[in-house]
């Protein structure tokens, strides 16, 4: 019984292995890869730009980060004034 079931399975597996890759799975030739390269790079650049802008806007809108940035600016300004008055 086991041999009766395993032989058709083995035949199907061998047929699939010997058939090779499907046309959609075949690797593209080098020239078509180079033809599509500028479009892919432009798409990648646009996606990266959009994500970077969204991240920067998200950081700018965070209340904690806004307060921290303000505090650092004020502290730096105070230090600058203190150094200016000390060495003048």
Curated annotation (Swiss-Prot):
One GO term describing the cellular component: very-low-density lipoprotein particle
Gene Ontology MF terms in the entry: fatty acid binding; phospholipase inhibitor activity
Short name of one Pfam family: ApoC-I
InterPro entries: ApoC-1_sf, ApoC-I
Signal peptide: 1-26
Role description: Inhibitor of lipoprotein binding to the low density lipoprotein (LDL) receptor, LDL receptor-related protein, and very low density lipoprotein (VLDL) receptor. Associates with high density lipoproteins (HDL) and the triacylglycerol-rich lipoproteins in the plasma and makes up about 10% of the protein of the VLDL and 2% of that of HDL. Appears to interfere directly with fatty acid uptake and is also the major plasma inhibitor of cholesteryl ester transfer protein (CETP).
GO terms classed as biological process: lipid transport; lipoprotein metabolic process; negative regulation of cholesterol transport; negative regulation of lipid catabolic process; negative regulation of very-low-density lipoprotein particle clearance; triglyceride metabolic process; very-low-density lipoprotein particle clearance
Similarity annotation: Belongs to the apolipoprotein C1 family.
Gene3D superfamilies in the cross-refs: Apolipoprotein C-I
Localisation per UniProt entry: Secreted
Protein known as: Apolipoprotein C-I
Location (main, coarse): secreted
Keywords noted in UniProt: Lipid transport, Secreted, Signal, Transport, VLDL
């Amino acid at each position: 019984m086991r041999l009766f079931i395993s032989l058709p399975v083995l035949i199907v597996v061998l047929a699939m292995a010997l058939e090779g890759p499907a046309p959609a799975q075949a690797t593209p030739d080098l020239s078509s890869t180079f033809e599509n390269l500028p479009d892919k790079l432009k798409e990648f650049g646009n996606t990266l730009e959009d994500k970077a802008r969204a991240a920067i806007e998200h950081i700018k809108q965070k209340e904690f980060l806004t307060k921290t940035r303000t505090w650092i600016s004020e502290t730096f300004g105070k230090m600058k004034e203190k150094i200016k008055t000390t060495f003048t």
